[in-house]
Design a protein with these regions (language model features):
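Extracellular/periplasmic, surface-exposed regions of secreted and cell-surface proteins
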Residues: 4-145, 212, 268-353
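Membrane-proximal, glycine/serine-rich, low-complexity loop/turn segments characteristic
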Residues: 4-9, 127-130, 153, 161-162, ...
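Exposed, low-structure sequence patches enriched in small/polar residues
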Residues: 113, 126, 156-165, 171-177, ...
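Flexible glycine-rich, low-complexity coil/linker segments exposed to the extracellular/periplasmic environment
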Residues: 4-24, 137-194, 243-267, 331
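Short clusters of hydrophobic/aromatic residues that line enzyme substrate/ligand-binding pockets
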Residues: 29, 64-65, 84, 121, ...
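C-terminal extracellular loops and terminal segments
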Residues: 81-86, 130-157, 194-204, 208, ...
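C-terminal beta-barrel architecture of Gram-negative outer-membrane proteins
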Residues: 215-276, 316
Length: 353
């Protein structure tokens, strides 16, 4: 039995939705258009003992496609994919590498890569004056920590500015006129752009040391000068926030906080880090004379992955998601990404024929 072919009655007497529109059609939706120019120089000197490159790019994306809120009615669903505006991105990348030391028995090779990117929303069209994102989950209603609007820098947090605590341990914030107000009196208009989760500099640095038949490889990586929103401290660092466990710091360095949590720059931290991603030690055995040229050589190696992280960030991992305009937080509610990276140990053999 059905009603308008969209609902079916189940054996228990309940009506179940069978089929219908799940998205609003937009017949005016067009392709995103990308325009980009690059200026680059590649170089190799001293018989390729020193090499590298430098690239600078500027990219404009028009007809940005994004899912925006629409009224019901006339629309059947509350969102629709639309072309909403344009974005500008620019950046550079520099690479240098080569043999630092080269002797008969010993070679030290190194490769250094530096990059920087920045972007902004150039225009928003139609009724899309702004778009909020990076919403925080319950308990409570913390709100959103990002806003996309004309002229906004990609990676900025759109949050309240912390002004201190009152005598009862409640948050004090700055309003739009820089007056200090109790957090309970705040409005959305008092939010401002604070900090940025886009690293000012991304660094990759690899080293390879070879001594006769031994080889040692070390890979390092660093993000420099960027902000991370420590949601763990915000949710679990305050006493009396619900029926769940809290951090030890809730009764230590955060014991003075008694009021409701607030999305403000009190929880922004510098996420700068240096990671040793991997260390590999190997030994190569010549095998031609032992296998009648069947095997040229065998390399035995061991690798330690995720060796260590050096950072001043107090959370679990400063390397948060920085892809998109509403990231930069340790989202503990995203279980697929929240678990810490484990250290790995690998033993292997490589056969060359």
């Amino acid at each position: 039995m059905c009603i308008r072919d969209r609902y079916w009655m189940l054996p228990n007497g309940e009506w179940a939705y069978s089929f219908g529109k799940t998205q609003n059609v937009n017949r005016n939706l067009g392709w995103e258009e990308k325009k980009e120019w690059n200026l680059g120089v590649d170089y190799s000197l001293f018989g390729n003992r020193l090499y590298g490159k430098f690239d600078y790019f500027k990219r404009t994306i028009d007809n940005l496609i994004y899912e925006v809120a629409v009224p019901q009615p006339p629309y059947t669903q509350n969102t629709q994919w639309q072309n909403i505006g344009s974005m500008e991105v620019k950046g550079w990348e520099f690479e240098v590498g080569g043999d630092i030391i080269r002797t008969k028995d010993f070679v030290w090779s190194s490769n250094l890569n530096l990059s920087h990117n920045s972007g902004k929303i150039a225009t928003l069209w139609g009724n899309n004056t702004y778009k909020n994102g990076n919403g925080f989950v319950a308990p409570g209603s913390p709100g959103d920590a990002a806003r996309m609007e004309e002229g906004s820098t990609i990676g900025s947090f759109y949050i309240w500015k912390f002004a201190g605590f009152d005598d009862e341990g409640n948050f004090l914030l700055y309003d739009k006129d820089n007056n200090v107000i109790p957090a309970k009196d705040k409005t959305e208009n008092d939010k401002r752009y604070v900090g940025n989760y886009t690293p000012k500099l991304i660094v990759g640095w690899s080293h390879t040391f070879t001594y006769r038949n031994f080889d040692l490889g070390v890979n390092l990586r660093s993000w420099i000068d960027f902000d991370v929103y420590n949601t763990i401290n915000m949710y679990y660092g305050i006493q009396g926030q619900g029926n769940f466990n809290v951090l030890k710091d809730a009764y230590g360095k955060f014991s003075h906080i008694k009021g409701e949590k607030q999305i403000c720059d009190y929880y922004l931290e510098d996420g700068t880090f240096l990671k040793i991603d991997a260390i590999t030690l190997g030994y190569t055995l010549p095998m031609k004379k032992y296998t009648k040229n069947l095997i040229d050589r065998i390399r035995i190696y061991g690798t330690v992955g995720n060796v260590c992280t050096i950072t001043g960030y107090s959370g679990m991992n400063p390397e948060v998601n920085i892809t998109g305009w509403d990231q930069g937080t340790e989202k503990f509610w995203d279980t697929e990404r929240f678990y810490p990276m484990v250290r790995t140990y690998t033993l292997g053999m490589q056969f060359n024929f």
